[in-house]
Design a protein with these regions (language model features):
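Concave beta-strand-loop units of leucine-rich repeat
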Residues: 74-84, 97-114, 118, 124-244, ...
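Beta-rich interaction/scaffold domains
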Residues: 1-80, 88-89, 95-99
Length: 303
């Protein structure tokens, strides 16, 4: 690795996986100058330090040495169909996928993938994270360090996901999505996105086993927010009783909550504007729809 010198700063850029401790360093300077500390005595090259260079005539100048740890990027889509492929990709310590990340396969005889925890190095996926039918994990552990993504897709409106063991949808570090979340799976029970504040696209869930749906800091959904609990018989299901998205202020499209059989209350305490409201198929036992701050509905209200 070669360092760059700009003004009085010496900067070396290395992949975040590389340690420079005890590195062999080659440096050149005029033999009449002195450097304090002597670089030959330094072993900890991973940390910032200052070197004082004194020329033969007594002029002194200080240089700050800095290390920049760069991300490891993968260009294009990454498709992981087997446990071996997951392990091989994880070994690269990639932090950024510049494309879609596709986990599993929809093929009938595809190998089951039960563990993606080795993908913990990932911090960003610019495209969609797609979970296919052969993923057999109970949650998305391994994607917990992803801060931003283009979208998250589990199944679709045409074909529901058959990931039979997937009970929890959660990504602990996720803060922003530039696209959609779409989850169509009968086994998903718990949904939790602790840090997700902005979704530029839509939120689409159809989960007939739903018990909990938590977005504690979500403020903005750019398009529709649609939550459903239809089961395979096309009837209302789910055991969630109370729905609250406490910080939500804006939904660009329609806010729709329907076909949740046990729902008794829903609260959107800070919602000010939405493109529409659709609560046309709610259970008889629903007691409360709380929208105390609503000011603007740009479309229809259906109840």
């Amino acid at each position: 690795y070669t360092a760059d010198i700009t003004d009085n700063t010496v900067t070396i850029t290395v992949p975040y996986t590389v340690s420079l401790n005890n590195a062999e360093v080659e440096f050149k300077y005029t033999t009449s100058a002195t450097i304090i500390p002597d670089p030959e005595t330094v072993t900890d090259w991973d940390n910032e330090r200052t070197f004082r260079v004194t020329s033969y005539n007594g002029d002194a100048r200080e240089y700050t040495y800095k290390v920049v740890k760069s991300e490891i990027e993968s260009d294009g889509d990454v498709e992981l169909k087997t446990t071996e492929e997951v392990a091989s990709f994880a070994a690269t310590k990639t932090t950024v996928v510049k494309g879609n990340l596709i986990i599993g396969s929809d093929a009938e005889e595809a190998e089951k993938i039960t563990d993606i925890s080795a993908l913990a190095s990932l911090k960003e996926v610019t495209g969609n994270i797609v979970i296919r039918n052969s993923y057999n994990g109970a949650d998305l552990t391994g994607l917990d360090n992803i801060v931003s993504a283009g979208g998250l897709q589990v199944g679709s409106t045409d074909v529901a996901s058959k990931a039979t063991e997937l009970h929890m949808i959660s990504m602990k570090a996720l803060e922003t999505l530039s696209g959609d979340i779409s989850v169509y799976n009968d086994q998903v029970t718990y949904v939790l996105f602790e840090k997700l504040a902005t979704i530029e696209g839509s939120v689409m869930f159809n989960a007939s086993s739903l018990q909990s749906f938590e977005f504690p800091v979500l403020t903005t959904v750019g398009q529709d927010l649609n939550l459903q609990g239809l089961n395979e018989e096309n009837t209302a299901a789910g055991s969630i009783a109370s729905l609250e998205i406490p910080e939500l202020t804006s939904v660009g499209g329609v806010l729709s909550v329907n076909n949740l059989a046990k729902l008794t209350s829903m609260s959107f305490l800070k919602l000010k504007e939405t493109g529409g409201l659709d609560f046309h198929t709610v259970p008889v036992m629903l007691e409360t729809i709380n929208l105390p701050e609503i000011e603007t509905v740009n479309g229809s209200i259906i109840m």
